[in-house]
From Swiss-Prot:
The keyword Glycoprotein applies. GO terms for molecular function: alpha-mannosidase activity; carbohydrate binding; metal ion binding. Its EC number is 3.2.1.24. Belongs to the glycosyl hydrolase 38 family. The active site is at D151 (nucleophile). Keywords: Glycoprotein, Glycosidase, Hydrolase, Metal-binding, Secreted, Signal, Zinc. Residues 1-23 form the signal peptide. The keyword Metal-binding applies. CDD domains: GH38N_AMII_Epman_like. This is Epididymis-specific alpha-mannosidase.
Amino acid sequence: MGRLYWLPLLAPLLLLRPPGVQSAGPIRAFVVPHSHMDVGWVYTVQESMQAYAANVYTSVVEELARGQQRRFIAVEQEFFRLWWGGVASDQQKHQVHQLLEEGRLEFVIGGQVMHDEAVTHLDDQILQLTEGHGFLYETFGIRPQFSWHVDPFGASATTPTLFALAGFNAHLSSRIDYDLKAAMQEARGLQFVWRGSPSLSEQEEIFTHIMDQYSYCTPSHIPFSNRSGFYWNGVAIFPKPPPDGVYPNMSEPVTPANINLYAEALVANVKQRAAWFRTPHVLWPWGCDKQFFNASVQFANMNPLLDHINSHAAKLGVSVQYATLGDYFRALHTLNITWRVRDHHDFLPYSTEPFQAWTGFYTSRSALKGLARRASALLYAGESMFTHYMWPAPCGHLDPTWALQQLQQLRWAVSEVQHHDAITGTESPKVRDMYVMHLASGMLGVRKLMASIILDKLQPQAPMAASSGAGPAGHFASVYNPLAWTVTTIVTLTVGFPGVHVTDEAGHPVPSQIQNSTETPSVYDLLILTTIPGLSYRHYSIRPTAGAQEGTQEPAATVATTLQFGRRLRRRTSHVGRHLVPVANDCYTVLLDQDTNLMHSIWERQSNQTVRVTQEFLEYHVNGDVKQGPISDNYLFTPGKAAVPAWEAVEMEIVAGQLVTEIRQYFYRNMTARNYTYAIRSRLTHVPQGHDGELLCHRIEQEYQAGPLELNREAVLRTSTNLNSQQVIYSDNNGYQMQRRPYVSYVNNSIARNYYPMVQSAFMEDGKSRLVLLSERAHGISSQGNGQVEVMLHRRLWNNFDWDLGYNLTLNDTSIVHPVLWLLLGSWSLTTALRQRSAMALQHRPVVLFGDLAGTAPKLPGPQQQEAVTLPPNLHLQILSIPGWRYSSNHTEHAQNLRKGNRGEVQADLHRVLLRLHHLYEVGEDPVLSQPVTVNLEAVLQALGSVVAVEERSLTGTWDVSMLHRWSWRTGSGRRRGDTTSPSRPPGGPIITVHPKEIRTFFIHFQQQ
């Protein structure tokens, strides 16, 4: 059944299959030396630098300089940047410049890391790519043009669009489903032109090469030796290199006695691969994980081997050459043959065998996934706040150099954690701790920066005390909205007193509510309704009622009341729905069943539709003993049977207030358990008149608690409805575009192979209604029954597989996690209009900076006095920042500066502002919001000053788009992209039009004060 599922995808491959190799003469093998250097995974970055990574660059640079024919490709930038900044000598730096100029050293991808494709958000992919590209362009004046995405666990359809927007000419991937790869090899369909975005189509297509079954590693088995082949430097040793230079498993040296045997092995492998591709050009990767730490011994053995093969090329039918990835793709492009087109479908999920579905990592280390996204959101807010502080003119005494350092530290950390063994949760515990430490340190620095900016603005008023804790005068909260839309939402603060007055900048009372904390009995949750224009602040004074000034008539925050329901056993009968309790706002009525303490149904006012909705927690019990069968681990999800309920009893309480009503459900493993393992806290907001609360009203906010789990359990939240969904769900690729996910029955492992990543949103629907889930971290998601959607929240695993144990890659995660989902229910038209903006509102919630009042509340500028930055509802401010790059936007001028060798004398440019705009909607998705949108950047950015110049750039900022000419590849579709990445546009003007799904990048220059 698995093979049959792929027949529709294989049909165009079979039709295009040529009768044979399309060229006479020998096969031409491009030997591409490389080292796969994971930024983390088993060892920390510093451990890897000490053991092998620094030696890779030191020895490769030395060896490339010794032979004109030698080549090497470098991929992730983190190790190279550490080597460049802390290890490389002046001579080695000069050699690198020379090798790059000669094309013998080539940077591919060029990002800080090789990011994961399944569980990363597009914004963070762009960030880490921009980080690496900015360094490479600033340092060398080069711009990577090819990708080498060989190790992410599955391929997203967002990736071809991302790399096309970055200016790449070709894309290389590897890990796709095993049975699909086998079929594509058979059909010689591993190369195609990928149009990943249905809206952008050929405008942002890219030629794509899928590696064959050998992937990125050199075939290590050679028939004449019991050692691995072609790895003459052996295997890296930790914690540091051996003093005698002898490593484990070093391949037998090439000698006159065995050179024919080596040549036969290499040629046989090249010919095997040639049969899987349409041209006689064969890419032969030479390398693997942690290779080339001794490039001398590598090239010393490969050089005579390649010379031997070439001297017998006519007889062997193969010629070989050292090559970069660019050399290979240029040779392919020169052939100018016709390639098939692949549409916007992705290559997820990824399986390597029938019982090895790599769908567990969609959820592994949920806490790290959540932290990574929170760090990204904080960085996003800090970038725009600092930019707005600097423009139109700095208003205080903040040191811009220090400020930029705080942002750069978090940029590095957020980029680092996008690695395909980081945010995936597939790293060892000590490496997880490294990522957490880097993120936490970076977040602390940016919070200090944001607090400093606030204090700079408040300095004349001096309302905050330096001490911590609740002072007698109360608290002061500054709330910053990083989105370029006006946002109405609830912010939640923790206070130590049960009665409070909340006032705004002008001293006016603010709608607020006080209630018992969900976490700590001794404190209280204070909920404040706030409306904040784009890139603006609100300031609130919070004082205990006992400390209010005498004689004032300020209304206090309303106090919520709690209605408790006794513990109910899990019912095994269908007699439910007889005693329902309604909880309502102006958009929804949630009906709760008193007999079960579970949700029963939701009525949506606008469509006047009621949908049965029940939620519960289940667990998959999985095997950890390899002797007993397939196992689950950090990567794999391998359930032996269906999930079972993880609770026997549930308590419920309703906390009802004038502003917010919360439904709290606590799930216990048995009737007498003292502590609950799972919880759902659902919130409906009652938006007062006079506030635009469309988004706030039309969502049910849910926070869950899961854990600690028992060993070898995988916890899911299952939402069951009466929607006739046909077991079809939709989940997103990287928060950018949606993929239809029909349930597929396989011979084996159907549960796991029908799990998909949800990075930001998912939904299911029937002809009348749609239920949308929005998330603030990645999860695995599936529909295991009609009208059902289940979200995997947490995993705790241990197994005795030697490989996992040897690398400490078991997942004995005893943490308690608190993921958040927002639910939207309504018609297709309603949810289409709200889904994208609501997802952004969840990802980029207002940032609250909290301090103690030292005296009377200050009078500060309210939103009416601030100049907001506002975009239309279908256009998202993807970034507004001051990158601080030290290069000229003029490529010729920058190249001249590099040749003069004065890069170190150039100061960080604090005047250039990076702006990126993202159209959120697909073509035809909404009759209004899917239209192209025209904006005047002078008007949009007037709060920052007078715009004097607008430069449109490539996605990562390194190309002037007027100078960017990507390769065009011949296709059989009848449509052909021109040689530019976008339609012709008027150059440099402030009035721009952004089309559906476009992401456009600009450098903005303001009039200096």
